[in-house]
């Protein structure tokens, strides 16, 4: 009922969660379209595991989690890009290798230092409630930066997504833009991990884009539709998790899954 929802919104942690969540969902959806089209959508998974490792080490050393995780994951994103572009190891294998190593390191560090406490499980499975005020402010600033970068550089991102060879021939610095997309994705993944958890963050990147592609024809329409889907599913997921006391991240993914099903049916007609 409305009164319950209004009651829910009176909590500061809920307000924080919704503001940060909507912004991060937008970032993930916009980047997701580009990543899915470039067949690079697994990078979200790889980076989230690296993020988990970084957060584990940060909490073991008593450092600020975001301050450690953001640079580490950005570095990993750039490395993964380099690996997948010019090496014998194919992109997906490189991602699998790096992500499983990072996850293993994270789990070992945690078990040696703190044990699997609540903070850790919130990184694995996500907890909207664990956002501190400082984290929320930082998350808002970073996600707005990601959105601005995407919007301002949209024509170039569009070009690099669709025809890298042609873009390179016409003098676009495709490597720079690929790196930019990777860096923006890295930031989004770290921000999203707090809400979605490391295990589910890639769905925030992939699902809205795939759903939008079922019904929309142009890149622009897909981007806008994907953004809308992402935000709506995020809000529905948070409401569901609040009322039924289910884990937030998983609830958001289920909302996305249902949406994907509906759009697939619509797209068939």
Regions found by a protein language model. Give the residues of each.
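C-terminal binding/interaction regions
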Residues: 4-9, 124, 128, 229-266
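Transmembrane helix-bundle core of multi-pass membrane transporters
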Residues: 5-16, 95-155
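Loop-to-transmembrane alpha-helix initiation sites
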Residues: 17-20, 65-73, 92-96, 140, ...
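Short loop segments and helix-boundary regions at transmembrane helix junctions
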Residues: 33-116, 212-224, 241-244, 267
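Small-residue-rich segments of transmembrane alpha-helices in multi-pass membrane proteins
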Residues: 50-60, 98-110, 130, 174-186, ...
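Membrane-helix/interface signature in polytopic inner-membrane proteins
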Residues: 148-181
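Membrane-interface capping segments at transmembrane-helix boundaries
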Residues: 155-156, 265-269
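Transmembrane alpha-helical segments in multi-pass inner-membrane proteins
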Residues: 194-195, 199-250
